[in-house]
Amino acid sequence: MINRIVSFFILCLVLCIPLCVAYFHSGELMMRFVFFWPFFMSIMWIVGGVYFWVYRERHWPWGENAPAPQLKDNPSISIIIPCFNEEKNVEETIHAALAQRYENIEVIAVNDGSTDKTRAILDRMAAQIPHLRVIHLAQNQGKAIALKTGAAAAKSEYLVCIDGDALLDRDAAAYIVEPMLYNPRVGAVTGNPRIRTRSTLVGKIQVGEYSSIIGLIKRTQRIYGNVFTVSGVIAAFRRSALAEVGYWSDDMITEDIDISWKLQLNQWTIFYEPRALCWILMPETLKGLWKQRLRWAQGGAEVFLKNMTRLWRKENFRMWPLFFEYCLTTIWAFTCLVGFIIYAVQLAGVPLNIELTHIAATHTAGILLCTLCLLQFIVSLMIENRYEHNLTSSLFWIIWFPVIFWMLSLATTLVSFTRVMLMPKKQRARWVSPDRGILRG
């Protein structure tokens, strides 16, 4: 009951902040925040991405002719693949995992109660491949339980966790484990997912997202201390760190965000390794994209509510930038909503003590935002072209994705944050088969 009261109070507070600004100061100030918060964050991402590239990334070996990574003391690596109804993808995924140039690996596929032919495919492959172990769960328990099961069965201290449709690059496992060998406080490393599905407008737009937004965000967050979340499709973990925090939570809709915060709130560090490439399938329909992003946004809100009080301990001060960024982005979304409502009420002729003359960007603000989109594209293209040379084929969509990114964030934040604050609950988070694209690119 207390959690419900607190969460309802938070929702009211988020709504009241823009209303108070508009009422006690001016509606124009409120709308300036709407226009310039994305502007400020984009500058942060550009500066952070460039800094990470100049002082770290550009010095790292990479390329077709680069030698296979040599890991200190030749540790074993366990690649864990949780699978649910992956009959179309799992065989290709396992073959890519086994094709690593680093040889001291084992692959563990966890069949999470699949109802298609996944079980039969895994059993056939396990009989033929010595380095492959298969675990079958009788019923669908959710990705968190599947990952826990794989971790319990693994022989290695270093766990590389990927989705059942993900294709690892030939050196991804070695690259993503390497930072943990040189820093004993690195508890997890997040990789660099790349989009395979590009046959529709929705697919091409996501190429722009992962090229011009996601990579810059990860680089920037790594520079100022902590990462909001590891990638759910490719991440490596130190098993002792997972054991310390209780592994993955089975009641959180996004186990990747939750485990990232659990590790960092226990003083473990998360590193970003852009050379750990992983090729993934993504939604290519608007319905599939909406469901996926709504789930991501809801996961962020759940983690925020879960850790809100713990964040204020002085030992967690490095998490404060992430906390304030999340709070301000959420307030930004509700400020947009309040602005639209006020403007609509004024158009209807209802008298208000708040004056709002426009909700669209001014000429100057529009030019600034468009220029920043172009600059962000140029920076991301210069950095990401190292890993994916055909990005110019998606040139048009990449340029405009920053605008689409913020609009999508606006809609999903409004829906998910309201849902979580009004209906906080604890139940097992189980997965369903997502939209995996219409045609593989």
UniProtKB/Swiss-Prot annotation:
Membrane topology per record: Multi-pass membrane protein
Molecular function via GO: acetylglucosaminyltransferase activity
Keyword line: Cell inner membrane, Cell membrane, Glycosyltransferase, Membrane, Transferase, Transmembrane, Transmembrane helix
One annotated Gene Ontology cellular component of this protein: plasma membrane
Result of knocking out the encoding gene: Cells lacking this gene do not synthesize PGA.
CDD domains tied to this protein: CESA_like
GO BP, sorted A to Z: cell adhesion involved in biofilm formation
Function statement: Probable N-acetylglucosaminyltransferase that catalyzes the polymerization of single monomer units of UDP-N-acetylglucosamine to produce the linear homomer poly-beta-1,6-N-acetyl-D-glucosamine (PGA), a biofilm adhesin polysaccharide.
Name assigned to this protein: Poly-beta-1,6-N-acetyl-D-glucosamine synthase
Source lineage: Bacteria, Pseudomonadati, Pseudomonadota, Gammaproteobacteria, Enterobacterales
Gene: pgaC
